[in-house]
């Protein structure tokens, strides 16, 4: 049974305004302090310690012999577009480097060009190596370093994308690779993205690319997360769960359970977690997301304590010919819905993500340094939230009324921080927060800052929208 906090009646609406104290009310105490809650983050060196990581897969590609893409899309404009969308990290795929050749190789020249453009527009760049297994042996690592040392002369070089969705069988090798990488590049990120709970048992054991198998168990998934953290010792845990499947407004079950498992295990290990946002479609059941669906994914992740947000995908993948969108037989770019088409044109999804990132950039800077305490649920939820994560109240907050909502509860240096989310992808509405006494609230909503003062704070939230409250 879900715990919910008491429903309170309220009238009127106030989005972000300043309300004076009635003569009988006690003024807010600006020095009120609570016990501090630990906070964990991974700093991407190029971005700085107070910039919230906002990543995307994949970077603008170049023409190459493996995937015969007809043009080189690495350009200054392409990286300006990345930055203008609010994304500050980009992961390579087709634009791979090659440590078995020299810096004069066209592949490495293309990566260097990407790094220079990324530096100009303040985008952290994660390289993808053709031969990352060279990190297994010290003598091979020495050869790899010749290339990486050149990359490292450009500040935007932020690490390497090692493997996407590995299985349990890969963890020992990944551990050895990370140890070698960390010897020489301790300030860079050894990046690996992990699978969701709906991966099959065979995929969790052997890696996503193997396919097949039976539905996995939660116990196996917990082992998968724990073993990766204990063996590989990542700087953060990145994973994906794509919930917008089948017909709108269905949301795939298990979304919050997956976040809960990852949040719990990373907190034990004292590392942060990053998560991917579904920003494309594929197959016959994964749909193109609306603005509300993008907002809901990002904002529920923030409410659960995510310290990094990533989008799949920025550039549309290719088919084997390199001339058409990949993975999606007989579909156009518009029917796929990534941020940028396979030939470099901005699509509707680009502007949806850009809209979401306005608030994410501002609120994320504060949440990055906040310790997560739990979730308050008001009303119904499209997916069940694990009982162990639910709070009935938090510090000064004693009641909630209005539309279905989630309130992520945080601490920042002994002060209360709340992240309020409209927990619907269909309807907008008002959420009222009732406090035990008069409070002065600083509010970040839609990238803008305002304030309210009183025993009640009221927010009007679009479907899926989130707002940050600092007391």
What are these regions (language model features)?
Residues 27-438, 445-471:
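Glycan-processing catalytic domains of CAZymes
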């Amino acid at each position: 049974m879900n715990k919910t906090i008491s429903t309170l009646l309220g009238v009127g609406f106030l989005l972000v305004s300043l309300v004076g104290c009635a003569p009988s009310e006690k003024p807010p105490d600006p020095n009120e302090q609570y016990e501090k809650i630990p906070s964990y983050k991974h700093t991407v060196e190029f971005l700085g310690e107070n910039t919230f990581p906002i990543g995307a897969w994949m970077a603008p590609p170049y023409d190459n012999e493996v995937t015969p893409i007809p043009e080189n899309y690495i350009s200054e404009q392409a990286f300006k577009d990345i930055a203008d969308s609010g994304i500050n990290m980009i992961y390579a795929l087709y634009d791979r480097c090659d440590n078995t050749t020299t810096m004069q190789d066209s592949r490495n020249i293309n990566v260097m060009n990407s790094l220079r453009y990324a530096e100009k527009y303040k985008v952290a760049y994660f390289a993808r190596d053709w031969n990352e297994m060279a990190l297994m042996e010290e003598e091979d690592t020495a050869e790899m370093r010749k290339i990486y040392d050149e990359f490292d002369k450009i500040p935007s070089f932020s690490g390497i994308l090692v493997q996407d969705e590995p299985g349990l069988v890969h963890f020992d090798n990944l551990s050895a690779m990370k140890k070698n990488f960390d010897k020489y590049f301790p300030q860079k990120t050894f990046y690996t993205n992990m699978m969701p709970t709906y991966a099959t048992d065979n995929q969790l054991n052997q890696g996503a690319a193997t396919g097949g198998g039976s539905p996995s168990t939660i116990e196996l998934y917990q082992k998968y997360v724990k073993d990766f953290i204990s063996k590989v010792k990542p700087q953060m845990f990145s994973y994906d769960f794509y919930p917008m499947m089948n017909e709108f407004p269905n949301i795939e079950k298990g979304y919050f359970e997956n976040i809960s498992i990852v949040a719990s295990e990373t907190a034990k290990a004292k590392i942060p977690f990053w998560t991917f946002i579904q920003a494309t479609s594929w197959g016959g059941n994964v749909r193109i997301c609306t603005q509300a669906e993008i907002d809901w994914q990002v904002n529920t992740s923030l409410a659960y304590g995510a310290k990094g947000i990533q989008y799949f995908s920025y550039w549309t993948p290719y088919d084997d010919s390199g001339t058409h969108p990949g993975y999606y037989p007989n579909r156009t770019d518009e029917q796929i819905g990534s941020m940028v088409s396979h030939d470099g044109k901005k699509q509707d999804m680009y502007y949806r993500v850009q809209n979401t990132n306005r608030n994410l950039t501002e609120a994320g800077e504060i949440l990055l340094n906040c310790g997560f305490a739990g979730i308050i649920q008001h009303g119904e939820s499209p997916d069940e939230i694990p009982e162990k994560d639910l709070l009935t109240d938090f510090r000064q907050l004693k009641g909630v009324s209005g539309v279905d909502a989630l309130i992520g509860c945080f601490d920042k240096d002994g002060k209360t921080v709340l992240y309020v989310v409209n927990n619907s992808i269909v309807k907008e509405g008002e959420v009222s927060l009732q406090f035990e006494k008069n409070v002065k609230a600083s509010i970040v909503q839609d990238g803008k800052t305002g304030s309210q003062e009183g025993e009640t704070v009221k927010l009007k939230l679009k479907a899926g929208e989130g707002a940050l409250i600092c007391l």
